[in-house]
């Protein structure tokens, strides 16, 4: 009745990503006022009172365009054909797993070339049990990459040399997924709706976005990991 078009996405894939784009224009100034939002948490009032999640709201036209393009793909409205030269957002089953593999490989190369100071991985997630990702992280730790995983629930990994695994137990449910690569102010920070599980990476519609460096989330999160709450 109100012109809402309800889409059910790609058949056979559960939609688990959380994102929206508002397209608007100021008629007086004739300028775009588009806004994009992407998050690790659900659009649910109940979740907001007891979950810890990460949200990003931006008017950056690059982010707005890529998030809109991704949403149209997830809605099965178009094929993801106009892949940008420098993507800042990835969708499961169309590039997210490959991007994570590349980031882990880059950390291994940095450990070999520059030492552990520039080869660090920090992961915060609900679950980690994807066999391929687990093996790659074990291999990275064996190559000298310093890895710290904060996992709330299912974890099929065990601590070992260069690999620390902890959980946070507190008043709120830790629900965000963050992947941080690098150290000393040169971190690359990614947030995602996906846990590191086969079903999320290959059988669901999930999103992962690179956080702008100016957001400062990487540095703040490193301090958070060094706290005494573990």
Predicted regions and their residues:
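PLD/PLD-like phosphodiesterase catalytic module centered on the HKD motif
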Residues: 1-48, 57, 62-64, 93-230
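Gly-rich Lys/Arg/Thr-decorated short loops/hinges at beta-loop-alpha junctions or inter-strand turns
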Residues: 78-89
């Amino acid at each position: 009745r109100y012109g809402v078009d309800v889409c059910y996405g790609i058949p056979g894939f559960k939609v688990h990503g959380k994102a929206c784009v508002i397209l608007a224009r100021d008629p007086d100034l004739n300028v775009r006022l588009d806004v994009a939002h992407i998050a690790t948490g659900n659009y649910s009032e109940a979740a907001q009172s007891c979950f810890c999640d990460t949200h990003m709201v931006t008017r950056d036209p690059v982010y707005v365009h890529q998030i809109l393009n991704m949403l149209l793909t997830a809605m099965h409205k178009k094929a993801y054909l106009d892949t940008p030269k420098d993507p800042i957002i990835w969708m499961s089953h169309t590039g997210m797993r490959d991007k994570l593999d590349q980031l882990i490989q880059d950390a291994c190369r940095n450990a070999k070339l520059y030492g552990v100071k520039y080869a660090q991985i920090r992961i915060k997630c609900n679950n980690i049990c994807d066999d391929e990702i687990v093996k790659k992280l074990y291999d990275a730790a064996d190559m000298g990459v310093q890895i710290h995983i904060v996992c709330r629930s299912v974890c099929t990994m065990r601590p070992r040399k260069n690999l620390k695994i902890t959980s946070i137990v507190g008043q709120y449910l830790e629900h965000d997924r963050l992947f941080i690569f690098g150290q000393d102010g040169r971190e690359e920070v990614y947030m995602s709706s996906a846990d590191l599980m086969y079903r999320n990476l290959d059988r669901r519609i999930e999103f992962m976005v690179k956080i702008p460096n100016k957001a400062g989330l990487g540095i703040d999160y490193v301090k958070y990991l060094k706290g005494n709450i573990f």
